[in-house]
From Swiss-Prot:
GO terms for cellular component: cytosol. The lineage of its organism: Bacteria, Pseudomonadati, Pseudomonadota, Gammaproteobacteria, Enterobacterales. Its EC number is 2.3.1.16. It comes from the Bacteria. The active site is at residues 99, 392, 422. Belongs to the thiolase-like superfamily. Thiolase family. Catalyzes the final step of fatty acid oxidation in which acetyl-CoA is released and the CoA ester of a fatty acid two carbons shorter is formed. Heterotetramer of two alpha chains (FadJ) and two beta chains (FadI). CDD domains: thiolase. It catalyses: an acyl-CoA + acetyl-CoA = a 3-oxoacyl-CoA + CoA. This is 3-ketoacyl-CoA thiolase. Keywords: Acyltransferase, Cytoplasm, Fatty acid metabolism, Lipid degradation, Lipid metabolism, Transferase. NCBIfam families: AcCoA-C-Actrans, FadI, PRK08963.1. Pfam families: Thiolase_C (PF02803), Thiolase_N (PF00108).
Length: 436
């Protein structure tokens, strides 16, 4: 085990997460159809500030992320500062780590607090799969640049005449990895086959996720962390995630056809997370600053770790690489955790990671460790459901998971929680949080 790495300031202050909030998550082209991610981000941050009761001028830094970026607002963080009543002098910058984006935002704010650069910051992320940057072909893009430099009408017409009809077709955002050309679902299929994960196991995990999420909503467990969002022109509202299947039936999952390997596959739309819109944010401070302001933190950030692996095989095993590092840096073992929350990009990816957590062979051959970190107690795992049920606005998921885990730890009287996620590009993230 590596030496523990405490997350404290030079004065010994811990990193406090004072509050967290998100919009309800909505499936693509439903409740938030036509609403860009920047507006979803403003909505979540504005309500977070209002609920906390803190003077917006006290926020010294905002770090926010967006995976599917819009060209007209490339720095979503700064737009949120300018649109939510914060001081114009509040520092703001944007980050992107694919599905682990808000994990990165939280880590960056934590590091700024530890360095003494700031004492109060906000971290989070927002994404919209309903408002997308529809592009143009490379041929048309090049022609438009050349046309802009052409001096005469005849020169411009000559440039346009070289284009073919297909060059005029709009180009949607890529769904495949830039480096490999593989879709996430292709990797999930590979992992299912390589690790012997059956269709039945995947469907069972998806069914479990929806059942637990539906139960959480029915019992009112999420109301303190999910706001009501009013949708322009403000005649309608959304108060709950609209992807959760309250009538989930295991038998219904078997009816769906594979979505990626249509002949021999097992990954379906039902055992994968859907395209989703939403935003989430957390308010962070040094422990002493929270006390000065009379604020009671939800909990504290104990450790974090990021990992990077090969993209050609098992690309979504990031949690299995990042989690051991986060545990080491927290000075704890897997058995010390009260809760474990893993991002469910796909049921196949989730189950593969659970297998690797318990695999001595994986630990020895891939991690250089003598033994596995251990088998996950499913009574601790994704106890309120996961991303398959809630949905996955890419940049918002990490902040959702952190906030949700802290609230559940508080309900259980405290303890330690792991939140971990895979991400495109072979990346992984893991964070340990603590509630007293």
């Amino acid at each position: 085990m590596s030496k523990a790495l405490p997350l404290v300031t030079r004065h010994g202050d811990r990193i406090a997460i004072v509050n967290g909030l998100r919009t309800p998550f909505a499936k693509q082209a439903t409740a938030y159809h036509g609403i860009p991610a920047v507006d979803l981000g403003k909505t979540a941050v504005s309500e977070l500030l209002a609920r906390t009761g803190i003077d917006p001028a006290l926020i010294e830094q905002l770090v926010f992320g967006q995976v599917v970026q819009m060209p007209e607002a490339p720095n979503i963080a700064r737009e949120i500062v300018l649109g939510t009543g914060m001081s114009v002098h509040t520092d703001a910058y944007s980050v992107s780590r694919a599905c682990a984006t808000s994990f990165q935002a939280i880590a960056n704010v934590a590091e700024s607090i530890m360095a003494g650069s700031i004492s109060i910051g906000i971290a989070g992320g927002a994404d919209s799969s309903s408002v997308l940057p529809i592009g143009v072909s490379k041929a048309l893009a090049r022609t438009l640049v050349d046309v802009n430099k052409a001096r005469t009408l005849s020169q411009r017409l000559k440039l346009f005449s070289r284009l073919k009809f297909r060059d005029l077709m709009p180009v949607p955002p890529a769904v495949a990895e830039y480096s490999t050309g593989l879709r996430m679902g292709d990797t999930a299929e590979q992992m299912a086959k390589s690790h012997g994960i059956t269709r039945e196991e995947q469907d069972a995990l998806a069914h479990r996720s929806h059942q637990l999420a539906a139960k959480a909503w029915e019992q009112g467990l999420l109301h303190d962390e999910v706001m009501t969002a009013y949708v322009p022109p403000y005649r309608t509202q959304i108060s709950e995630d609209n992807n959760v299947r309250k009538d989930s039936s295991l038998a219904s999952y078997a009816k769906l056809k594979p979505a990626f390997d249509r002949k021999h596959g097992s990954v379906t739309a039902a055992n994968s997370t859907p395209l989703t819109d939403g935003a989430a944010a957390v308010l962070m401070m040094s422990e002493s600053r929270a006390k000065e302001l009379g604020l009671q933190p939800l909990g504290y950030l104990r450790s974090f770790a990021f990992s990077a692996i090969d993209v050609w095989e098992d690309m979504l095993l990031g949690p299995s690489y990042a989690t051991p590092l986060a545990l080491d840096r927290a000075g704890i073992g897997l058995a010390d955790l009260t809760l474990i929350d893993m991002h469910e990009a796909f049921a196949a990816q989730t189950l593969a990671n659970l297998k690797m957590f318990a695999s001595d062979e994986f630990a020895q051959q891939k991690l250089g460790r003598s033994r596995a970190i251990g088998e996950v107690d499913m009574d601790k795992f994704n106890v309120l459901g996961g991303s398959i049920a809630y949905g996955h606005p890419f940049a918002a998921t990490g902040a959702r998971m952190i906030t949700q885990t802290l609230h559940e730890l508080k309900r259980r009287g405290g303890g330690l929680g792991l939140t971990t996620a895979c991400a495109a590009g072979g990346l992984g993230a893991a964070m340990i949080v603590e509630v007293e």
